[in-house]
């Protein structure tokens, strides 16, 4: 590549990172947190571990909660979220029950604050569009970064953490970018398509069918095809249906049971889920039974859709790390997805640190560290407040974030301010994880493991910063 063209790519990479880097880190951190959003909600409520109750028992309990309704939607429990949700319609779920104890569970927790931050920056649908645009920015950074460093693949294993903070940040930036490149591309493209695709669908619906825009979504979902009635069994109850469903449809994983007109002869039962080997969500894979007794009358299968529709369907599960459709590999891929998200945060933060360390006393450098360190520190305080804080968690998050910004602006040494932030976060994550791990007998242990990993990352940064502040030689300052 010509030197002039490579220099232009390098300048574009630095400019895009400088302008959008802080927002990108905030969204990536919130996204990584969101991967464990459901587990963190249970973590906050200190729910015990144990074997889940039979699915038929949980379903009967759920239907009994809203027995007077014309329609009931029951979201079935999963390994990641052992809770059964009873809804009047999707999004309106007044009853949540633990799949282990059958006891009520709170529908929300303060740990949902960073999740909302990632989804829409607390700005509703316009915020969702802004978040999607950062996916475009990340794509630009990934392309320009690959062009700049494409001849340095041999350096992907190098991490000089004992030779100064700048070299450590530089190597960390290269290492995370090269090792996690496929996942970063996945995050960028699916993140951009997630919001922009929804916006495009909404605009199309207003133009094509302004009187009934929901019809566009119905067309995307596809129509039910009639099954071959020969050999299909009939069921006297929903419980019997769910018990025999795995044997009858071994590749179908149920996630939602919808009942219309329960208790009547014209009742309709729709079981939504995913199929093994097909990336999708519950609204695109459905089986429908009608009447008394229940007879299979419709099958909706995304495999019958066109290639572009199937790509649209796959965006959400790929972006949120929902790998249920890959059966046995799902836990490992979900863990890898989280690690890639964690690496994406390190990638962005190390790139911003390189810029901030070039002018540590400038206002922009201090704001960068404060705005990026703020949400991490605020989440640490959120986790600690689950045990002994009398403060309102929704007020704690923005307050701690703002205090962190002022702290980095006013503290004499920026590197020492960052060192203190890293130490507090590391100690807070370790304390919260260990206390929960031992007090709840291992429930949500994978959440505690993720918190300990985050603490290790903060501690490593603290060690490097401590060496920088301790060392006065020219070698350590470079």
Predicted feature locations:
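Conserved histidines in hydrophobic membrane contexts and catalytic metal-binding motifs
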Residues: 1-478
């Amino acid at each position: 590549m010509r030197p002039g063209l490579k220099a232009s790519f390098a300048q574009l990479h630095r400019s895009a990172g400088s302008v959008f880097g802080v927002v990108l880190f905030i969204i990536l951190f919130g996204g990584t947190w969101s991967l464990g959003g459901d587990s963190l909600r249970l973590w906050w409520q200190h729910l015990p571990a144990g074997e889940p109750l039979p699915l038929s028992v949980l379903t009967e309990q759920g239907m009994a909660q809203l027995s007077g309704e014309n329609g009931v939607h029951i979201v079935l429990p999963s390994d990641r979220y052992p809770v059964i949700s009873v809804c009047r319609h999707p999004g309106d779920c007044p009853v949540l029950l633990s799949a282990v104890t059958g006891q009520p569970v709170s529908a929300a927790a303060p740990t949902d604050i960073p999740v909302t931050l990632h989804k829409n920056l607390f700005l509703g649908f316009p915020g969702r569009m802004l978040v999607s645009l950062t996916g475009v920015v990340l794509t630009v950074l990934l392309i320009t970064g690959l062009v700049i460093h494409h001849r340095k693949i041999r350096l992907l294993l190098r991490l000089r953490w004992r030779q100064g903070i700048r070299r450590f940040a530089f190597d960390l930036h290269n290492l995370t970018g090269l090792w996690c490149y496929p996942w970063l591309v996945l995050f960028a493209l699916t993140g951009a398509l997630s919001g922009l695709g929804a916006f495009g669908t909404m605009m199309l619906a207003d133009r094509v069918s302004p009187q009934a825009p929901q019809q566009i979504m119905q067309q995307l979902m596809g129509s039910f095809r009639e099954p071959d009635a020969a050999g299909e069994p009939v069921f006297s109850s929903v419980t019997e249906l769910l018990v025999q469903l795995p044997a009858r449809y071994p590749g179908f994983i149920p996630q939602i049971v919808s009942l219309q007109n329960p208790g009547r002869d014209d009742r309709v039962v729709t079981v939504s889920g995913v199929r093994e080997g097909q990336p999708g969500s519950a609204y695109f894979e459905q089986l429908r039974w009608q009447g008394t007794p229940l007879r299979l009358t419709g099958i909706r299968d995304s495999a019958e859709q066109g290639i572009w529709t199937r790509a649209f369907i796959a965006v959400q599960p790929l972006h949120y790390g929902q790998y249920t459709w890959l059966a046995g590999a799902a836990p490992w891929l979900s863990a890898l997805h989280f690690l890639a998200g964690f690496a994406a945060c390190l990638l962005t933060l190390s790139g911003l640190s390189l810029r901030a360390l070039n002018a540590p006393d400038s206002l922009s450098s201090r704001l960068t560290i404060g705005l990026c360190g703020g949400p991490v520190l605020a989440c640490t305080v959120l986790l600690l407040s689950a045990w002994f804080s009398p403060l309102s968690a929704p007020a704690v998050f923005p307050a701690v974030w703002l205090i962190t910004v002022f702290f980095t602006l006013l503290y004499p040494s920026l590197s020492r301010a960052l060192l203190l932030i890293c130490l507090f976060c590391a100690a807070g994550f370790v304390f919260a994880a260990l206390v929960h791990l031992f007090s709840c007998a291992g429930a949500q242990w994978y959440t505690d493991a993720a918190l300990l990993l985050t603490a290790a990352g903060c501690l490593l940064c603290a060690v490097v910063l401590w060496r920088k502040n301790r060392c006065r030689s020219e070698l350590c300052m470079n």
